[in-house]
Amino acid sequence: VRVQSLTLVAAGVALLAPAPLPAARPSPPVAVREGNVRAADLLAKVRDCVPVSKGRYRSDARSRAEIPVCGARGAVFWKADMDIDCDGRPGLLCNGRNDPLFSGTTAYQQSDGRYLSAETLPYVVVPTPSGIWDYRVHGIRGGSVVAVIYRDRVEYAVVGDTGPREIIGEASYATAKALGIRPGPHGGGTSSGVTYIAFKNSRVSPIEDHAAAVTVGERLARKFVRGG
């Protein structure tokens, strides 16, 4: 009888023991809303394009050159896709193991001399200056503030890297993640629907200060929406 009682007790304990949890699945990117200027209000100001580029860009190497850079009061803008830049300072996600095309450098560097971190810093990639367009002529440089708009989201980023001369539409892992876009270098990004508004003669220093980019970006976005 004693043995039977012990057996029943052991069975009861087993029933009360917590079941093993299922393996955790990677969580989807979570969009983060920054500032108070609405995406719709910004998009209303960039409906029409007055080209400032001398030609048009491709969204990738195989696509047709159909994307102009447009001028606006106090800004330039383009409407494109978003490819993912996972370059710069290596991290847990952006490194040579995860991305065979990984480059450990960015065109611009932090205040401490290190390259930017695509994982943690929202930044935009602009085309290397060419006969199509030279961003520097329009008051854009490393650290300039860019409002990146996707659906109803606005993310304030900085110009942080340069890319191919004939391709436009690229931003860092952190930018994509903040907008709810798949951020990985493989299968990440989106094929269309992204608007980039780069504010002329703006600059965040140090370039890695994202809070400052949000503050400056929000102020310039409000001014842009008001038409000034």
Give each language-model segment a name.
Residues 123-125, 158, 195-197:
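Soluble periplasmic/extracytoplasmic beta-strand elements of cell-envelope proteins
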Residues 165-175:
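Short, solvent-exposed secondary-structure boundary/capping segments
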Residues 155-164:
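Short beta-strand-centered aromatic/proline hotspots
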Residues 25-153, 166, 178-186, 200-228:
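Cell wall/extracellular polymer interaction/catalysis modules
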